Swiss-Prot record:
GO terms for molecular function: metal ion binding; rhamnulose-1-phosphate aldolase activity. Its main location: cytoplasm. This is Rhamnulose-1-phosphate aldolase. The active site is at 117. It holds the Pfam family Aldolase_II. NCBIfam families: PRK03634.1 (NF002963), rhamnu_1P_ald (TIGR02624). It catalyses: L-rhamnulose 1-phosphate = (S)-lactaldehyde + dihydroxyacetone phosphate. It is an enzyme of class 4 (lyase). It comes from the Bacteria. It comes from Shigella dysenteriae serotype 1 (strain Sd197). Its cofactor is Zn(2+). InterPro entries: Aldolase_class_II_sugar_metab, Aldolase_II/adducin_N, Aldolase_II/adducin_N_sf, Rhamnulose-1-P_Aldolase. SUPFAM superfamilies: AraD/HMP-PK domain-like (SSF53639). One of its GO terms (biological process) is pentose catabolic process.
């Protein structure tokens, strides 16, 4: 029998959650992570599935995700513990044929359930599937320290925030030319914040929740982690810059345009125009 804990997707989730914990982005039960799978990914592991998978209805139907499996982090679970007990802290779920709910096929033992941010994740998956023609498969939410800090001192405006991050590190425009979406502060774990996040995910692969954290999307766990890591590194540089009295020189608009041309990306126009 194949052991699902040795599968590429469980091992990938272990690495991503452990790395995020070591970065200091996911204290206690902070943060959540979901990866969209294919039936072929889980086909070898049916013997590992629960004999009677629990069924949980969704608060709103997700027709686009019908019959789709995911691996998800659990509600109230600590990222630091995923590596110690994957089955207790992760779960493989599969949305039913009409998108009304999902079965927990593996993991989430002792009656655990998926992350409370599952509505935000599933809604964002729907939008990123449409925006990227199915390329994006990962949604990651974490409490990246310096990005959160900047939401207290920068104008919480997409163009302003994006331009500052682009100027904070040269690679940022190349990694996220589509910029960073920003929400107003909202109560987490609700359909409302999920819908607002998904709306921004139509246009941006990164979405900030002021005074809370960040959502990122990408085609793989590595790409999504790297996206957030790149933005967070720039935020760290900016925090140091502001603590030293602010910028005396920076990357100019003309230089940002040249950077975009060199790497074949189209920078967010509103951020470039500032």
């Amino acid at each position: 029998m194949q052991n699902i804990t040795q599968s590429w997707f469980v091992q990938g989730m272990i690495k991503a959650t452990t790395d995020a914990w070591l970065k200091g982005w996911d204290e206690r039960n902070g943060g959540n992570l979901t990866l969209r799978l294919d039936d072929a990914d889980i086909a070898l592991y049916h013997d590992n599935f629960h004999p009677q998978p629990r069924y949980i209805p969704l608060s709103q139907p997700m027709h686009l995700l019908a019959n789709t499996p995911f691996i998800v982090t659990g509600s109230g679970k600590f990222f630091r513990n995923v590596q110690l007990d994957p089955a207790a802290n992760l779960g493989v779920v599969k949305v039913d044929s009409d998108g009304a709910g999902y079965h927990i096929l593996w993991g989430l033992t002792n009656e655990a359930v998926p992350t409370s941010e599952l509505p935000a994740h599933f809604l964002s998956h729907c939008e990123r599937i449409k925006a990227t023609n199915g390329k994006d498969r990962v949604i990651m939410h974490c409490h990246a320290t310096n990005l959160i800090a900047l939401t207290y001192v920068l104008e919480n405006d997409t163009a302003v925030f994006t331009r500052q991050l682009w100027e904070g590190s040269t690679e940022c425009l190349v990694v996220f030319p589509d910029g960073v979406g920003i929400l107003p502060w909202m109560v987490p774990g609700t359909d409302e914040i999920g819908q607002a996040t998904a709306q921004e995910m139509q246009k941006h692969s990164l979405v900030l929740w002021p005074f809370h954290g960040v959502f990122g999307s990408g085609p793989t766990l590595d790409e999504t982690f790297g996206l957030i890591d790149t933005a967070e590194k720039s935020a760290q540089v900016l925090v140091k810059i502001y603590s030293m009295g602010g910028m005396k020189q920076t990357i100019s608009r003309e230089e940002l345009i040249a950077l975009g041309k060199r790497f074949g990306v189209t920078p967010l126009a509103s951020a470039l125009a500032l």
